[in-house]
Regions:
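Conserved phosphate-binding/catalytic loop of the ribokinase/pfkB sugar-kinase fold
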Residues: 56, 81-83, 93-130
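Short, glycine/polar-rich helix-capping loops at beta-to-alpha or helix-loop-helix junctions
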Residues: 161-168
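Positively charged, low-complexity intrinsically disordered leader regions
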Residues: 1-22
C-alpha cells in the first residue's frame, strides 16, 4: 500500500515558560528552540522510517526548502509538494514547567491546497492506497470525498479542532486519529448534529 499524506508542513518555534501566558501578560521564556514539523511532516517521516512508501503532498512557501529537504532525507517522496509565494505554515508552541503545551498554528501555505491540486495528486493513486490527512490544511472535506470516490482508504487526524470540523464527511473516514480534546469535541459535534 502506498501512502499519500496530504499534510501540513510547519516551522515550529517552541518557547519554554514557567506558566502559560495569560491575557495582557508578558512572560520571559526559559528556553527557545526551532524545529521543522507540522503533524503532516511528522507523520510522513514516522511512516517512512517504519518502512512505508510515503508520498508527501502539501504546500510550502519560499522559506520551506528545509521542510522539503528533511522529508527527502528521511525517504519521503516530495514530487507532490506545491511551491507557493505564501510563507510556509508555522506554529508558536508554549511548553510549561510540567511539560504541557499550548499551540498556535498559522496555516500559511498549508491553506493553499486547492481542489484542483487534490484532483491532480489523487489521479496517481487508487484502491490499494491510503490518503492521510490532518486538519491543518485546506479543503479537507473535498480531499476525503475525492479519495473515497477513487476507492482509497482515508485516515484523518482531526487536529486542530476548527468550526468546520463538524461539517466534514467523517462517515467516509476509515481511520480517525484524535486525542482527548479532539475526540470530545467531535463527539459533541456528532451528538448535536445527529
Amino acid at each position: 500500500m502506498r501512502i499519500c499524506n496530504l499534510g501540513s508542513l510547519n516551522i515550529d518555534r517552541v518557547y519554554g515558560v514557567e506558566h502559560f501566558v495569560s491575557a495582557q501578560e508578558t512572560v520571559l521564556a526559559t528556553k527557545y528552540e526551532r524545529f521543522l514539523g507540522g503533524k503532516g511532516l511528522n507523520q510522513s517521516i514516522a511512516l517512512a522510517r517504519s518502512g512505508g512508501t510515503v508520498f508527501h503532498a502539501g504546500a510550502i512557501g519560499p522559506d520551506g526548502m528545509s521542510l522539503r529537504q528533511l522529508l527527502e532525507e528521511n525517504g519521503v517522496d516530495t514530487r507532490y509538494l506545491k511551491d507557493t509565494h505564501t510563507a510556509s505554515g508555522h506554529a508558536i508552541i508554549q511548553v510549561n514547567a510540567s511539560g504541557q503545551n499550548c499551540i498556535i498554528v498559522s496555516r500559511g501555505a498549508n491553506a493553499e491546497i486547492l481542489p484542483e491540486d487534490i484532483d491532480r495528486i489523487l489521479s496517481d493513486f487508487g484502491q490499494a492506497d491510503l490518503l492521510l490527512l490532518q486538519n491543518e490544511i485546506s479543503n479537507v472535506d473535498y480531499a476525503i470525498q475525492a479519495a473515497k470516490a477513487r476507492g482509497m482508504s482515508v485516515a484523518f487526524n482531526a487536529a486542530p479542532v476548527t468550526p468546520e470540523l463538524h461539517t466534514y464527511p467523517i462517515d467516509l473516514v476509515d481511520y480517525l486519529i484524535v486525542n482527548e480534546v479532539e475526540g470530545l469535541s467531535l463527539l459533541g459535534c456528532l451528538l448535536y448534529t445527529s
